[in-house]
Regions:
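Residue-level signature of catalytic and energy-coupling elements of molecular machines
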Residues: 3, 37, 83, 127, ...
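Translation machinery proteins
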Residues: 14-68
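RNA pseudouridine synthases
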Residues: 58-72, 79-105
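Positively charged, low-complexity, intrinsically disordered RNA-binding extensions
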Residues: 109-218
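N-terminal glycine-rich anion-binding loops that anchor highly charged ligand groups
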Residues: 1-17
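Helix N-cap / loop-to-helix initiation motif
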Residues: 31-34, 76-79, 119
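Flexible glycine-/small-residue-rich
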Residues: 7, 59-61, 69-73, 112-116, ...
Length: 218
């Protein structure tokens, strides 16, 4: 869907369409076959194809857990009905658009493999020059975070460096998180999973603190 929407929005040429470049990068990182990528591009070029709309729904789950559900849909009535139903089923409430935006910050996130022979000091300087806010270096991966307005600059810089980006996306990072006891947190995570299982849902963001105990249960 993301590739198709990007093509409909700004055309089928990745060179002049940063969003399409990002979508193709993510598809390749997820090992999507080349034929599937081409089909998605062609679907976006088809004027008669069903048109997808992007929409974000915001609301609260129990214990003050804020949730933003990003969707891509060809039927808004179906999608909002499903999202409202999930909120209700898990004891939450669907809010109005934009009501929770102050609780999250939009950041660009890039994940790439930590390749042998990479000179980390030089790489970090390149990233900082391109607008990196945070660089996390782990055993096998490097995660670079940037403010939303620097997303394009960072994408271009990584392309210039021929970096093998596995994930390139905009995320909603909570300004503060809420810590719950394990049982309450597990109920919240069941609700998050219900959102993620809906075919129209692309991403789900929340402000639940994912402690080690919670992660062990996932």
């Amino acid at each position: 869907k993301e590739i198709t929407i990007a093509v409909k929005e700004s055309g089928p040429d990745p060179e002049s369409n940063p969003r399409l470049r990002m979508a193709i990068t993510n598809a390749k990182g997820a090992s999507m076959p080349k034929d599937n990528i081409e089909r998605a591009i062609n679907k976006g070029k088809d004027k008669d194809a069903s048109s997808f709309t992007e929409v974000a729904y915001e609301g609260y789950l129990p214990n003050g857990i804020a949730v933003v559900v990003e969707c891509q849909t060809d039927n808004l009535q179906r999608t909002i009905s499903n999202i409202r139903s999930i909120f209700t089923r898990y004891g939450g409430t669907l809010g109005t658009s934009g009501s929770l935006s102050f609780l999250f910050e939009r950041n660009g996130v890039f994940v790439l493999p930590k390749k042998e022979g990479l000179i980390l000091d030089d790489f970090e300087l390149e990233m900082i020059d391109a607008g990196a806010e945070e660089i996390e270096i782990e055993e096998d991966t490097i995660t670079v975070s940037t403010m939303m307005e620097n997303f394009g600059n960072m994408q271009k810089k990584l392309e210039e460096l021929d970096a093998e980006v596995e994930i390139a996306e905009l995320q909603r990072v909570p300004n503060d998180t809420v810590t719950l006891d394990l049982e309450s947190a597990k109920k919240i995570m069941r609700a998050i999973e219900a959102f993620e299982d809906d075919d129209d849902v692309q991403k789900v963001f929340h402000n639940l603190e994912l402690t080690e105990d919670i992660m062990a249960e996932l």
